[in-house]
Amino acid sequence: MSWCSSPDAVFHLAATGLLLQIAVPCLCSAAMNTHTRQPISHPTAEHLLAWYDRHHRELPWRTSPAMAAQGKRADPYHVWLSEVMLQQTTVQAVKPYFLKFLAAWPDVNDLAAAPVEDVMAAWAGLGYYARARNLKKCAEAVAREHGGVFPDTEEGLKELPGIGDYTAAAVAAIAFNRQAAVMDGNVERVISRLFVIDAPLPGSKPAMKAKVAALTPADRPGDFAQAMMDLGATICTPKRPACALCPFNGACLALARDEPERFPVKAAKKAKPVRLGAAFVAVNTSGEILLRRRIDSGLLGGMTEVPTTAWTARMDGGTDASHAPFVAGWQAAGVIVHVFTHFELRLTVYRAQVPDGLQTGPDDGWWEPVTNLDAQALPTVMKKVITQAIPSACRPENRN
């Protein structure tokens, strides 16, 4: 056993003025010695599945090995819903949304029949809202064209709206036990370290996927896919991987070089462009906020917002009160910053107190009580805007 003297691995116990230092075994890669590594020369599905059977994560959408042994099969609807939600989103963030969706729409036919406004409102806060629109379209296609039954092959799944290579492979493997190569960010990290793939992402993805395909077994391919994800999420983490606990540590080339954290290699990120705009929070005497619905296409399509200007890269464009949707006593309330995938948005926020019954035009939205904001499909950026203008608006005490 290797013992670590780093500050992170020393516990200090203070009792009646006595200070104790207790050394603990170190699980990080820097302390790995040859006698702590697994005696395997190359990674195999067998080693990983043995680890997974003991250490898998319990997740609400997952069929565990014990459940599978009792004859329970994965629900394709649950697998598909969770995989769409998990794209670029953490497990902890997804759990409550997954359970909320299941409570509202227990199967794909229920989701297909749901009003799109309800789906968007339920998705609000999870981000990447095109996923929600495609989720609804996909559910409708499954209900309409497949009788509520998901196709059971990668090719068939990819014909559905919003399902690409990754989601098709994940659903095919996990729900239908197809021998599909499933590769998310966690799997990329594991594979790049196992085989010391020096080419930077995203260009190295095809080489990585070929490695995954070669490792994926014909038996239990779904469990293998989930095991790879769990390994990356819990052991082969981006920082301070717990290499001593890894079932592949004896075959890991990055560990043999003592540099697992160098992988995966990523291309240098370009600075995100900045877009500017203004947002206008109008509050009437009854404590209602003027809201409107964005057009269905494009960024945040179909979501709810307060009136805003266009978001522009021009440094002289659309950030003052002269661009307000109507004349009122607009007062500057500050600036919020929100980072999207491809750009950074800076919105100057204005607030105005207006009388009840103000006519804003037939296409300018509706007045919503502050206490009912949780029921609206407000994306995170709009919650930031409203909170900037009305600090208490999105606090729990103001919710019904």
Regions found by a protein language model. Name each.
Residues 42, 46-47, 51-244, 248-261, ...:
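Catalytic cores of DNA base-excision repair glycosylases
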Residues 13, 18-67, 230-400:
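Intrinsically disordered, low-complexity, charged terminal extensions of DNA damage-control enzymes
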